[in-house]
Amino acid sequence: MNSTMSDEPDALSVVNQLRDLAADPLNRRAIVQDQGCLPGLILFLDHPSPPVVHSALLALRYLAECRANREKMKGELGMMLSLQNVIQKTTTPGETKLLASEVYDILQSSNMSDMDNVNEMNYRRRKAQFFLGSTNKRAKTVVLHIDGLDDSSRRNLCEEALLKIKGVISFTFQMAVQRCVVRIRSDLKAEALATAIASTKVMKAQQVVKSESGEEMLVPFQDTPVEVEQNTDLPEYLPEDESPSKEQDKAVSRVGSHPEGAASWLSTAANFLSRSFYW
């Protein structure tokens, strides 16, 4: 990479931009169909910086939510092998191992029979737990209803708050119903998520639970903040002057509303990836 150009994007800013675009369901097909972005995300899985690897996995997790993408993603050169390497590498943080295993499970199950699918996913989970070690327990899912989660800038604030919590593996926003589905380590309390979201000063979280009759209920968290262990190995995800919040509406709507704009940005990302990895 040519570091002499002051306007040259670095690896973290590029992968974060891809992650933010992949967070919007309208963009997922276009990103996977682009010739440079999916191979680039695979190469990022072998990047020496843990935040780059984790952000690439979040992007892949978003892309894999689109069923139409899964076969192409699974068949992309190096995808499954790179995911295995992340899971098995001894230096990979525990949350990153779990996220890589989750993406692997989704892609591996894309063309299996139901029984093969169950057996393979159970095997992957056992293997991930082995590499995580005895101090890391199985992940759990927490569904949050977030008052105030009503636009893209609020979503970015919420995302930044969650990324700072040690033990958060992945999350998916459901903006239409003001919800966020969060995968966390089982030893992390859901109250920590509420504390982090409350720290934004403009949003407040309640937990969505099901009653015995199957009806959904909103359960408020205690008003007393709990101590949140910070994810010290991750930098602030984007520097303030590069934060996507100011341009989020424009950036996220590009694929659906302005294909030429999205193509231009994806081309820029692909050129960066080409210069960085293929010489």
UniProtKB/Swiss-Prot annotation:
Major location (coarse): cytoplasm
Bias (Basic and acidic residues): 243-252
Pfam families, per database record: Arm
ARM repeats mapped onto the chain: 36-78
Gene3D superfamilies found in the cross-reference section: Leucine-rich Repeat Variant
Region (Disordered): 236-257
Keywords annotated in UniProt: Cytoplasm, Membrane, Mitochondrion, Mitochondrion outer membrane
Coiled-coil parts of chain: none
One Gene Ontology CC term in the entry: mitochondrial outer membrane
Listed GO MF terms: metal ion binding
Role description: In association with mitochondrial contact site and cristae organizing system (MICOS) complex components and mitochondrial outer membrane sorting assembly machinery (SAM) complex components may regulate mitochondrial dynamics playing a role in determining mitochondrial length, distribution and motility.
PANTHER family: ARMADILLO REPEAT-CONTAINING PROTEIN 1
Protein name: Armadillo repeat-containing protein 1
Organism in which the protein naturally occurs: Gallus gallus
Lineage summary: Eukaryota, Metazoa, Chordata, Craniata, Vertebrata
